[in-house]
From Swiss-Prot:
Taxonomic classification: Bacteria, Bacillati, Bacillota, Bacilli, Bacillales
Source species: Bacillus licheniformis (strain ATCC 14580 / DSM 13 / JCM 2505 / CCUG 7422 / NBRC 12200 / NCIMB 9375 / NCTC 10341 / NRRL NRS-1264 / Gibson 46)
PROSITE patterns: PGLYCERATE_KINASE (PS00111)
Subcellular location(s) of the protein: Cytoplasm
The protein's name: Phosphoglycerate kinase
Main location: cytoplasm
Associated pathway: Carbohydrate degradation; glycolysis; pyruvate from D-glyceraldehyde 3-phosphate: step 2/5
UniProt-listed Gene3D superfamilies: Phosphoglycerate kinase, N-terminal domain
Modified residues (Phosphothreonine): T299
């Protein structure tokens, strides 16, 4: 990684503004999944052990620049305290005189969680005044929020113009793993691209076609490719305006010598529900009033074989509507193949793919699960992420 890390800077006795991703699911004022809080612990613990005064800043939900009582970070601060085993204080604002007064009472190693940065309209606009107000609180800026690195916001980009800016350990690991996968991959290198829409994955497919040995397509976006081959897709998801693009991707794969895998059979249903009538049909025989909602058995076996013969697999997007058990077998088959492939380094690109491996209880069998859905996607597209660009070079 060519960016400075938290280890490249002396933080003892200094106030550190650390941007983390604590955008966690909540119910009845309690954190229901603390994965993202745990992911930030190594950086937080390191900063406290080094004697920094640690300010933690995060967004939670989408309050749209207004205070929303149920999106305060109070329950998050409480959960962090339990996980870290020490008192964690909470501020009622994210900047200003009251916060400065609290900071003046902090001792080395203390932690103060600032209020939800998205309560301020300037955050998502990357407002220079808000950026400066955040910077005025601290001596050093650490960004450990890879999940928000694709956003040019005040707390992810603007603040870095005013302070020494370095990466936390989570950010560093994400950039190293994803960077190595794209610049110097072990081969055979396989990418699995799923999810609902071709339009969301155009950039990543274009980028990966230049790098991979095998490209596997699944999920709702597959049916635009099926249609491009001249088959009818019934009531399945279809982007009419992307059919020509799908054809061009298949042509480019052929030109580049990339093995392009698409479903050969699919699970179709007469209704979008768990108790729908379902059957597996060849991809060329989808009934006109049925909808394909998962890959079929033959396709599952083919995809599993490709995975097991790969040295590196990057996975972004499910194979079907895995949230409904009846349509989860394809996504589960991919997750299980990755879990069983001992010689394969597996990179799960956040978002739905990460949720799927969690759901199937296979998360601990994956080599790396990215904490950023949108960020990992943009990184794999070859885009420079604003939150990374803003950090100091080594």
């Amino acid at each position: 990684m060519n960016k400075k890390s938290v280890k490249d800077i002396d933080v003892k006795g200094r106030v550190v503004f650390c941007r983390v991703d604590f955008n966690v699911p909540m119910k009845d004022g309690k954190v229901t999944d603390d994965t993202r809080i745990r992911a930030a612990l190594p950086t937080i613990q390191y900063l406290t052990e080094q004697g920094a005064k640690v300010l933690l800043a995060s967004h939670l939900g989408r309050p749209k620049g207004q205070v929303s009582e149920e999106l305060r970070l109070t329950p998050v601060a409480a959960r962090l305290g339990e996980l870290i085993g020490k008192e964690v204080k909470k501020a009622d604002e994210a900047y200003g005189d009251a916060v400065k007064a609290q900071i003046s009472e902090m001792k080395d190693g203390d932690i103060l969680v600032l209020e939800n940065v998205r309560f301020y309209p300037g955050e998502e606009k990357n407002d220079p005044e808000l950026s400066k107000a955040f910077a005025d609180l601290a001596d050093v800026y650490v960004n450990d929020a890879f999940g928000a690195a694709h956003r040019a916001h005040a707390s992810t980009a603007g603040i870095a113009e005013h302070l020494p800016a370095v990466a936390g350990f989570l950010m560093e690991k994400e950039l190293e793993v994803l960077g190595k996968a794209l610049s110097n991959p072990e081969r055979p290198f396989t990418a699995i691209i799923g999810g609902a829409k071709v339009k969301d994955k155009i950039g990543v497919i274009e980028s990966l076609l230049e790098k991979v040995d095998n490209l596997i397509i699944g999920g709702g976006l597959a049916y635009t490719f099926v249609k491009a081959l001249g088959h009818e897709v019934g009531k399945s998801l279809l982007e009419e305006d992307k059919i020509e693009l799908a054809k061009s991707f298949m042509d480019r794969a052929k030109e580049k010598g990339v093995n392009f895998y698409m479903p050969t059979d699919v699970l179709v249903a007469d209704d979008f529900s768990n108790d729908a009538n379902t059957k597996i049909v060849p991809v060329s025989e989808i009934p006109s009033d049925w909808e394909a909602l998962d890959i079929g058995e033959e396709t599952r076996k083919t995809y599993a074989d490709v995975i097991k013969n790969s040295k590196l697999v990057v996975w972004n997007g499910p194979m079907g509507v895995f949230e409904i058990d009846a349509f989860a077998k394809g996504t589960r088959a991919v997750a299980e193949a990755l879990a069983e492939a001992n010689d394969t380094y597996s990179v799960i690109g956040g978002g739905d793919s990460a949720a799927a491996v969690e759901k199937f209880g296979l998360a601990d069998k994956m080599s790396h699960i990215s904490t950023g859905g949108g960020a990992s996607l943009e990184f794999m597209e070859g885009k420079e992420l604003p939150g990374v660009k803003a950090l100091n070079d080594k």
